[in-house]
From Swiss-Prot:
InterPro entries: WecF. It catalyses: beta-D-ManNAcA-(1->4)-alpha-D-GlcNAc-di-trans,octa-cis-undecaprenyl diphosphate + dTDP-4-acetamido-4,6-dideoxy-alpha-D-galactose = alpha-D-FucNAc4-(1->4)-beta-D-ManNAcA-(1->4)-D-GlcNAc-undecaprenyl diphosphate + dTDP + H(+). GO terms for molecular function: 4-acetamido-4,6-dideoxy-D-galactose transferase activity; fucosyltransferase activity. It is a peripheral membrane protein. Belongs to the glycosyltransferase 56 family. The gene is wecF. One of its GO terms (biological process) is enterobacterial common antigen biosynthetic process. Pathway: Bacterial outer membrane biogenesis; enterobacterial common antigen biosynthesis. It is an enzyme of class 2 (transferase). Catalyzes the synthesis of Und-PP-GlcNAc-ManNAcA-Fuc4NAc (Lipid III), the third lipid-linked intermediate involved in ECA synthesis. Coiled coil: none annotated. This is TDP-N-acetylfucosamine:lipid II N-acetylfucosaminyltransferase.
């Protein structure tokens, strides 16, 4: 059997590193179909930190796409597993037959599914991408994204799968003995990316709570974002006193980020699509409820796991937040499907489907 090749077709360092390390640590030892990778970006020590993987790095999307297409044409039995698919050339290859449907398996990350960019080139490309998506062999995604995708592509096979968020299962009970009282701290957004709509989110938080809460805005990622960070800071200072606004411009290491999250009482995410599952998982693990946009279909995954969900359209106050905290504390977090190690079973099944071992 031809070994499955995994494709990380865009230079998204944080996510790519997470996927590679997950495969190296959790999957590669037991499956030959979890070892071959083609990645856009620099090595930056990844090969050394993932010794069980065979990783080929490419300088850009185009060079990787050309290599994938060449492999696909040379051997029609070769199958590819695309982790997030932001590479236009690969969509066009699927649409034109350069890559066959039986060769194309796609794990939806979120931004690669929704059509939120307003630029002309995106508006011209989106219809072509929709046509190509009809030809995917199988999609893997959250429950909410599967539902969203099925509305326009009902004939494409869909399977439940969660991004392998870095988590320590031993921390699942860490919040149970914590007492929450006094001024609330609210986390706004999961990164410095503009898709978080930070300014709109800050205004929404202020409308709900006024200047009675402390707001923390993590913006250390992506890099070279100083102008936008300052824009958010100034907008925040028009709404909140300086002591109640903390805009973080430095990237935090994982343990420091966990410590930050544990100091919060609520996560507030205004974006209208699925994103930031990693931060949501870590907040839920810490017993911290989250406010979502009703257009973000991840609420379906949360309710399926019997987790409380608050919405940006709800009338929120401290009593409602504290009640959501109490409800969350009563949930057995060891049973949540999108937590580690529970998502591992989904990955094992995904590999079996993509290789044809499971019909």
């Amino acid at each position: 059997m031809t070994v499955l090749i995994h494709v990380l077709g865009s230079d998204i360092p944080h996510h790519n590193r997470t996927v590679l390390r997950f495969f190296n640590d959790a999957l590669a030892a037991t499956s030959e179909h979890a070892r071959e990778f083609m990645v856009v970006g620099k090595d930056d020590g990844l090969s050394d930190s993932c010794p069980t993987l065979s990783v080929q790095f490419f300088p850009g999307k185009k060079s990787l796409a050309e290599a994938v297409i060449a492999k696909a044409k040379a051997n029609r039995q070769q199958r590819f597993f695309f982790h997030g698919q932001f590479n236009p050339t690969l969509w066009l290859a699927l649409l034109s037959g350069g890559i066959k449907p039986s060769q194309f398996y796609w794990h939806i990350w979120g931004a690669d599914l929704y059509e939120l960019s307003s630029g002309l080139r995106y508006k011209l490309f989106y219809p072509l991408r929709r046509l190509a998506q009809k030809r995917v062999g199988c999609v893997f995604a959250t429950r909410g994204d599967l539902s969203f995708f099925a509305k326009t592509h009902p004939k494409v096979r869909g399977e439940l799968l969660y991004f392998p968020t870095r988590m320590d299962p031993s921390l699942n009970t860490m919040a149970n003995d914590r007492q929450r009282e006094g001024k609330m701290t609210i986390l706004v957004g999961n990164s410095g990316d503009r898709s978080n709509e930070h300014i709109a989110a800050l205004r929404a938080v202020h409308q709900q709570f006024g200047d009675t809460v402390k707001v923390v805005v993590p913006m250390g990622y992506p890099p070279n974002n100083e102008a936008y960070i300052e824009e958010v800071r100034q907008a925040g200072l028009e709404l909140f006193s300086e002591e109640n606004l903390q805009v973080l411009s430095e990237k935090l290491e994982f343990d420091a980020y966990l410590t930050l999250l544990r100091q919060c009482d609520l996560g507030y995410f205004i974006f209208a699509r699925q994103q930031g599952i990693g931060t949501l998982c870590l907040l839920i693990q810490a017993g911290i409820p989250c406010v979502l946009n009703r257009e973000n279909p991840f609420w379906q995954d949360m309710t399926e796991q019997h987790l409380p969900v608050l919405f940006t359209t709800d009338d929120l106050n401290e009593d409602i937040v504290r009640e959501a905290q109490r409800q969350l504390a009563s949930v057995d977090k060891n049973t949540i499907a999108f937590f580690s190690p529970n998502y591992l079973q989904g990955w094992q099944r995904a590999l079996a489907i993509a290789t044809g071992e499971v019909a």
